[in-house]
UniProtKB/Swiss-Prot annotation:
One of its GO terms (cellular component) is extracellular region. One of its GO terms (biological process) is lipid catabolic process. This is GDSL esterase/lipase At3g62280. It is found in: Secreted. It comes from Arabidopsis thaliana.
């Protein structure tokens, strides 16, 4: 009897040790997965694509706050995607079009300023997706030849694919319709179709993790308020263009529906919809609460109040000036957010209160 009890004790001890070893091995494996980000988009997340792609000079004062030089980013410093990289303890994303000193080991950025979901300009979403397919295929070829500084097949499979696009489509449609709601809304399904095809293509090539930003409150941009004649009835309670924000909300509603549809279609994929609109609108509405000033004024521009924006002297052009304290400004150049505002947005995103389904960046690896 004593021998039997001792054997059972030994058996359970060995079993527990085995489970512990397996558990530790699994934990170690998960912790060793390094985050990889692959981004598609426009100027909201362009880290130098337009500079490399078309040679458009974007120098100081752009970049003055953090990089202290022009990097191709349209802003005074870091973008949302840069703060994501910092949070994940990885280097900033190199533009796909950068031919001089790119680092593609932990990701790549296909975003180009001015890009649209529809095939309107040089680097629309469909072209960015084609570039991705070529990049993936070429990376595999080079790795098979001995290269070790690129994303391997497992890396592409475990990468997070981020999409932030659509604002330029909506603005162009608004301009074409003389700021009329109905004609713009009629074009939204075609915009969403391009995003759908993009996600489907990435999925076809092995992508299983998606992070999709909706579009922000376009009607709160100082540029829009400055270039379009309007009266008080055109504005909402915080002074933003109603029609701009209404079309943005219509687009976002359709984008959320699309994400839900694709989530049902791709059972083995994770697709997170991030409500950037709500974060940015809250910042503009409650700016004093968060230590900001003048939400409807460009920090870098010309003309003074109410919007400090003039097409003849935009940020960086002769005559333009920079506000006294950029850390308290929300909008940098009339369109793009300041580094301080981008940090606010990322801090809000990382609470998981604005993502559907609720998911954090850290949980993807």
């Amino acid at each position: 009897m004593d021998y039997t009890v001792s054997s059972l004790q030994c058996f359970f001890l060995v079993l527990c040790l085995s489970l512990l070893v397996c558990s530790n091995s699994e934990t170690s494996y998960k912790s060793n997965k390094k985050p990889i980000l692959i981004n598609f988009g426009d100027s909201n997340s362009d880290t130098g694509g337009v500079l490399a792609g078309v040679g458009l000079p974007i120098g100081l004062p752009h970049g003055i706050t953090f990089f202290h030089r022009g990097t191709g980013r349209l802003g005074d410093g870091r973008l949302i995607v840069d703060f994501y990289c910092e949070h994940l303890k990885m280097t900033y994303l190199s533009p796909y079009l950068d031919s001089l000193s790119p680092n593609f080991k932990r990701g790549v950025n296909f975003a180009v300023s001015g890009a649209t979901a529809l095939p309107i300009f040089s680097f629309p979403l469909a072209i960015q997706i084609r570039q991705f397919v070529h990049f993936k295929n070429r990376s595999q070829e080079l790795i098979s030849s001995g290269r070790r500084d690129l994303i391997d097949d497992n890396g592409f499979r475990n990468a997070l694919y981020m999409i932030d696009i659509g604002q330029n489509d909506l603005l162009l449609a608004l301009y074409d319709s003389n700021l009329t709601y109905a004609p713009v809304v009629e074009k939204i399904p075609s915009m969403l179709l391009e995003i759908k095809k993009a996600i489907q293509t990435v999925y076809l090539y092995g992508g299983r993790k998606f992070w999709v930003h909706n579009t922000g409150p376009l009607g709160c941009a100082p540029k829009e308020l400055a270039i379009h004649l309007h009266n008080d009835s055109d504005l909402d309670p915080i002074g933003c263009f109603r029609v701009h924000n209404e079309v943005a909300k219509a687009f976002n509603k359709g984008l959320l529906s699309l994400c839900n549809e694709l989530r049902s279609q791709f059972k083995d994929a994770t697709l997170v919809y991030v409500d950037i609109y709500s974060i940015k609108y809250k910042l503009s509405a409650d700016f004093k609460l968060y230590g900001f000033v003048d939400p409807l004024m460009a920090c870098c521009g010309y003309g003074g109040r109410p919007n400090n924006y003039d097409r003849k002297a935009t940020c960086g052009q002769p005559g333009s000036t920079i506000c006294r304290d950029v850390t308290k400004a929300i909008v940098w150049d009339g369109v793009h957010y300041t580094e301080a505002a981008n940090r606010f947005v990322v801090d809000a995103v990382l609470t998981n209160r604005y993502s559907y389904p609720k998911n954090s960046l850290d949980r993807f690896w």
